[in-house]
Structure formats: structure tokens, C-alpha cells
Swiss-Prot record:
It is a multi-pass membrane protein. This is DNA translocase FtsK. Gene3D superfamilies: 3.30.980.40, P-loop containing nucleotide triphosphate hydrolases (3.40.50.300), Winged helix-like DNA-binding domain superfamily/Winged helix DNA-binding domain (1.10.10.10). Residues 167-208 are annotated as: Disordered. Consists of an N-terminal domain, which is sufficient for the localization to the septal ring and is required for cell division, followed by a linker domain, and a C-terminal domain, which forms the translocation motor involved in chromosome segregation. The C-terminal domain can be further subdivided into alpha, beta and gamma subdomains. The alpha and beta subdomains form the DNA pump, and the gamma subdomain is a regulatory subdomain. GO terms for biological process: cell division; chromosome segregation. Pfam families: FtsK_alpha (PF17854), FtsK_gamma (PF09397), FtsK_SpoIIIE (PF01580). Essential cell division protein that coordinates cell division and chromosome segregation. The N-terminus is involved in assembly of the cell-division machinery. The C-terminus functions as a DNA motor that moves dsDNA in an ATP-dependent manner towards the dif recombination site, which is located within the replication terminus region. Required for activation of the Xer recombinase, allowing activation of chromosome unlinking by recombination. PROSITE patterns: FTSK. It is found in: Cell inner membrane. Disulfide bonds: none annotated. Belongs to the FtsK/SpoIIIE/SftA family.
Amino acid sequence: MERSPLPRIIALTFGTLLFVSAVLLTLSTFLPLFTLHRASHWFFVPGTLLYETYAFSSLLVPLLLLHTALLLFVGGRSLRAESALVAFPLLFITAVCGEHGLYALRRALAARSISPSTRGGIDIVCVLCLLALLGAELYAALIYGERCYVWFHARIPRDFIADGFQDPSFPPSTADHPDTVSPPPAPSCATADVQTPEASAPPEGQFSTEVPLQGGEFLISEAEVQPATQVAACGGVSTPTALAPSVPSQAPFPLLPAPGLIQSNLPSDVHAPASPGSLPSVIPAQAPCVMALSPISAPSVAPAETLIPAQDDEQGPPRPIPASAAPLRHPCRGYQVPYDLLDQYSEDTYEGIDELTKNLALLLEETFSEFNIRVEITGIKKGPVVTMFELLPPPGIKLSKITNLQDNVALKLAASSVRIVAPIPGKHAIGVEVPNKKRSLVTFKELLHTRTAGSNRMAIPVILGKDVTGEPQVIDLAQTPHLLIAGATGSGKSVCVNALILSILYHKCPDETKLLLIDPKIVELKLYNDIAHLLTPVITEPKRALQALQYILCEMERRYALLEQLECRDIKTYNKKIQEKSIATQPLPFIVIIIDEFADLMVASGKELETSVARLCAMSRAVGIHLVLATQRPSIDVITGLIKANIPSRIAFMVSSKMDSRIILDEMGAEKLLGRGDMLYMNPSQSFPTRIQGAYVSERELARVIAHVRAWGTPEYLDEEIFFDDDDASISGNFVDESDPLYEQAVQVVQYAGKASTSYVQRKLKIGYNRAARLIEEMEARGVVGPPNGSKPRDVLRS
């Protein structure tokens, strides 16, 4: 189809107008500079205004119009010409600023006694510098414009197969395999018309057809061929007939090359080289039936001949064989998230011991001396948020006597809270942590640049923040192996979860680590949708969350079966072995399950969720499945003993009471934290928790990183069949064929209490609300409890 000439006509019209405008504006600017031509006519007004405003820099305006006109005149304009056009505003601003700067320099030199020759030399140097700067800017615009163009188009993967389908003139590669023609299904029949392409025949060597084999298979040639027509079936002939060419007598040149034709329709080895022959000069009266040829529809992509089974050799023409796709690019190849996506904040210096810190040390000694405890300051370590004073207590003093003075020390130092560590692990001293007057910001970008020594060898490195000494704290989630995060609202829990996910996105590609995000609050993790690391879209419903965890349990058992077959103890050994022996195509990825508000799921699902989580925590470490549970309500019914026993690594943010701190860490201390990322991290290798200031990640940084990761590739979600909607198999535990196994236990609960309600059964049996309501309805149907009694519990009718 021919292109419309209208766009070209419009471009030439606008180009002519711009060219005429450039000439007129140049004359309007230059002519008033001469004595013979005054700027009194209206023609000279635009040039006069430009010159009075921008002086000689105004000559760049008609130059811009002329350049734009040339671009419109020339159809095949270059990339550098377009880059120069885009860079014009920068060149114009530079010229104007440089010229005004030169005039200011002249006025400054006018008050000095400088010779005219020196002034002229200064003017020449300034003009040359300005021209050099303009040339450098133009050169940079041309170079970086081309680089930006290449970078932008390199991010858009080209589909060469699709390009071949869209461009019928794409020449196929037929050097390795000669063209062949299908033998006729019968040696003789009525004369049939052989269709040729509508246009003139293409050059020699651009046709290829399919050759049926004896075993019901077809040979994939270098290109896919779509049969144009099917000739009528012919009767059988007992004697073999020589194959006639499928070329009409009026054809200007043969459609097939002369050598390589099959000489007989008898069964023969398809891989045997065909004997050379020549086309007969006379077409027989009864030409054998052959399949009409059609132009090649796609370029060659198959590297070698491939055999695939066919349905039936005798049922019509063979089915066209689709071209096999080229091997996909490995998703991890070149995966990298730039550091520039993160914001750079001003660096705060907090390492130095200033006079204020020394005064606090003196006040600390004075405070303890008021209670007849003579302590000695042996060290001061200043961190981004708190400063730790190391005290050496006198002999014979109980540590409990010192720790009980936390509130008195806070009052004396005018601090919001003071935490006393008695003793400091591994030291002969007591630590007193006092908040700094000015908190320093710990950024995620800073910690990415200053990694710890062993972070490169970690399987799943996670950046937490800095400790009280200012050292970066990076943990390996694969060694943790599970993590519990708890803290009150506004303590920094959500920022910690975002920093954890961001650490995975920066260090691991989608083929190395997969994420399963569960967000009952709906708004916290929704922004991570459509990234390639996700197994499923972010789950917000409790029912789908439990079904996803049940799928992970099945995946865990499948991985254990794979490890058993290769006699491996963990996923690291398995991936190493399959790589050495080339057993599998790609290693097993790690799976990280992040549940943002675990308390809401426990209320909705109850016992089933606790059982699934406990089983995953107990068994999934060896197969590379790790859990991160976050909650803001660290009560005993949410963080049960079964879950705590299987999650030894925990992070506690600021909580409201000592009891909450004991539930999380099994000790006090979290109630003394400052909030805004101040945390206590406890792992199995340490007997005392470590105080850390969490890394800060803003929402703008998250949006930029997620947008970059989304552009890398699309996610491959699990099949939606794992999220079944059948009420008979829902998470509430509906049993059709038989009674609920918990029915007898529920009857005993209501008979012992003398009252029956859905919420009471739900709390006592630790089950979901739907299942508890179904148990109450079943008791009512069997006459155990009475009908609903408004807001009061039901009456127990039978004991």
C-alpha cells in the first residue's frame, strides 16, 4: 500500500514558511544596525526588539528557524540534527548569559586604567571562551543524544521472528538445506490448475516445502510454508511415474532450482542426497498431482532439522509446521537496579565526641554517685540515634541495682528514655544508651554503598540499618531462616518491610528469588504488583492467603522429593549439583513469604493458619522457603508459642508495655525504644538483642525502583486454580459427607460454659468465624442449643 503524500506536503509547506521567516527576521535584525536603514518601518520592529533584548545572541533565533526548515525539507533527517534542535534552548541561554557577562566585564574594566589593546585582548579571549563553551555543549548534545537513543531502543527487545512475519521481503536462509517438493498423493489424475503467487515469482531459492516421511513424520525445512490450495485426489496407479515440474509453461523462470528434485515417488530415505536431474522440456499430458506452492511467510529460525509426528499421511496435505521460536534470553542476564534511583540525603556527622556528649558523661557519673554507686566511664560510642556510655561498676554491686535506676538517669539527663544493658555482651562493662539531641538519618542508599564484608556471600542479603556504633547491619535471610517483625503503629515496621523487599530487588533477580506478598490491610504492599519477582498478585483476602500457604506446603514437599532423589541436604547443594551435572535447566529459586499484618489473618483463619505457618517454619528452611511475619499487635493469641518456637529471629520496634516486649523478645527493652526505625534485633547466634536504627526508604524511592523492576519483565504468576472458590473446600472447613471433626469438642465447650455463641466457640477452638458459625448452626439443628437470643448467647438445651 502506497503512503499518502499529505504528510510530506504539510512538512514542505511549514518548512517554506519557516525559511521565509528566518530570512525576513535576519534582515529585520541586521538592517537597523547600519546607518542607511533606520528601524522606523514596521518591518524592522521584530528584529529591533530581539536585538535590544538579547543583543547579538538574538541571531540564534533565525538560525533556529532555518535549521528547523531544513529538517522539514529533508525527509531522512539524522539523529544528530534532531539532537542539535533539542539542545537549542541550552545554547541560546548560554549565549545570552555569556554576552551579558561580557558587557558586565567591560563596565567593570572601564573604571580601571587599562590600555585599549589589553581590553581588546580580553574581549577576544572572552568571545573565544564563549564560542568554545557553545561548541562543547553542542558536541555533548550530539553525543549524549545518540547514547540516549541507543539506550532507549536497547530496552525494547526486538522480536526478529515477528519482524520477519511483518516484512514479507525478509530473505530466508536456505544455504544448509536444499528446497524440496512434496510428492503427489497419486501418480495420475485429471489435470489440475496449479496456483502461483499473485505477484511475479520471487528469486530462486525462496521457496521450501514439507517432505512427508515413511514413519508418519514431517521434516521441518528452513521456513514455514502455508499451502495455497489442495488438488483433487487421484486414483491409484500400479507403476511409478516420474515427477513432473510444477511450473506452468508460461512461467518466466522456474519457481524451484533445478538440482535437488526428488526423482521418484517410491519410498526412499529422506536423508539420502537427491540425485541431480533436469527439468523435462515437455510437460506430460497427465501431469501428476502436486501441492501448489506459496511464498515463504517467515524467515528461518530452526538451527537443524526437527521431526514431529503427523496425524495421517493419506488425509489431505500436511499441516503447516509453525516456526520454532528462538531460545529466550535468560531473565537474570544483565539484571541490575541502578543506585541512582535512590535519593541522596545530606550526610550528618555523628561520630565525633563533642562537648555536649562529655557533659552527659559527667552527669551520668554524678547521677550514680547520688545513689552511692561509684562508676567509671571507660568508653563512649556515638551512633546515629543513641550514644552508649560504657560504665565500669565498683566491685560488689548487684547489676539489678543499676538497672533499676533507668528512670532516675533519664530524669537527670533530661532524656525521653534511657536503656541500660547490664552487662554488655563480651565486655566487662555496663552500657547506658542515651538518645542523641539530634537524630541522624540512616538512608538505604548509604548502606548499599557500604556493605559488610560477608554480604557478597549471602544467599538473600537484607539491609537492616546501623547499630549504636554506626556499623552497617546486613543479615542473610536464608540463615535466619524466618523473621518476626512486631511493633506499634508509627514505630517504623512498614518501612522495615519495604527495606527488606527493596534489598531483595537490588540483590536478586526474578529467577533467583520469588516473592509471595500477603497484605490484609490492602494498601501497604499493593504497589509491588506486576513486578517479575511475584508468584501471585499481592493477596489481600484471608481465604486466598491460606490457599496460597497450602500451595507453598505442596511446593515444599515437592522440593523435598527433588532433594531426596539427588541425595542433597539443602537447596544450595541441590542447585550446585544440577549445575555441575546439567540435570535441570535452571536452579530452584528461593521463595520469600511476607505477611504484613499477621494478626488480621489469625483472627480470620485461626487454627488452620497457625498450623500452616508452624509447619512451614519448621520444615521449609532446607528447601529455600522463608517467612517474614509482621504485626502491630504482639499479643499471645497472635504470636503463639508454636510460632515463636519456630521463628528464633525477631525484630522488635517500639511497643507500649513490657509485656509486649517479653512476647516478642522474651525480655524487656522494646518499651524503651524511641520509634521511627529504632529496633532491637535478636537472632539465634546472639544471646542479647542488638539495637539498630533502621534504614529509611521514602515512597518516591520505592516508586522509582518498582517502576524500573516492572520495566525489566512481566511476572509469571501461578495458575489461578490454586485459589479455588468451592464452598465445600473453603478455609472455614465445611464437611459435607460427615460431621465436622471439631463438633464433639465444640459441644463440650458450650456445655461446660452453659452458653453458646459463635465468637465464644471461635476463641476457644481457635478457628475461623465461618466454621464456628457452622458448628453453632449444627448444634441448633440437633437440639443442643436454642435459637438466637438477640445480642445474648444462646441457651444450652441439652447437657
